């Protein structure tokens, strides 16, 4: 069987640029690759997935999470842990874990030890939700952002997870310039705690309409000071945080996740290609572990542009000089093709890892994939979390509610 690889850069008719056998494509996805000095045996990455299972009220990782990550660890495989808040004020999602207390570090230590016992690797994703939050989650302080946008908290489509269920975000305020150094310091402290917790590296969450993204994109950043206006100014916070994180870990144990032209959480920019081209160029100077790129065909956990090719990874491939992790709506065949074509070095899967704990094995051996149940993505208990089995013929049904 021969498979055509299509060049999405071409205007007009799509151009077939190469022909690879099915076996050649699969072999590329399952060839070794190094991330810094970490030697991975395959290129199937577990994407960061918020699952709302940490212990309340202190956002502490628990034994349920240990089992979940143990099930999904693989020899030489990379797991990027779920979005993890850097401070109480950074919180924005009920029962999402943190990395700002000793109890949280102790909880994460159990998880990283379990992943390492299976000879896998794990990065912590560091997260500040910014305006995408509610005072009942932050514990009192109003959410902060690059600028104030009342349309955001008045939009009935914008919802955040709280003790009272899914509600509209609280009104937010603009971060004062004197406060920004404290935000950067919180990222650095969380990076230190990630090292104490046994992670192999850290990823900055700079996508999906959270705080760093709110500074990057001019639909949300209306500032007139040194952190607003030009692309260079809007990218300043991102680069300061990367500086802080690399000062703890070294450059080759830090990754950055971006979402070019992403619309989740009300995001927009007047020239996203220019913005993210600049970001990728600036990140080149660090020599990072990887750049993690979410395709714009995905909005949150929904594919909104079915059939659209991986355009973001494709155009940034020519700009970013390090490893690229592509994410967002990939199927097994398209994941294999994007690596074979060279537009990405690794592919991150989210929803398929929810329902297929042994996903790398299934992809390599071409085994059937289990369906996932969206109704149990954020249910605070074991249902739809640790009850999806590894592959067994005839045992591929969605777990019962």
Label each region the model flagged.
Residues 1-25:
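N-terminal amphipathic/basic-hydrophobic helices that include classical n-h-c signal peptides
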Residues 21-401:
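Flavin-dependent oxidoreductase catalytic cores
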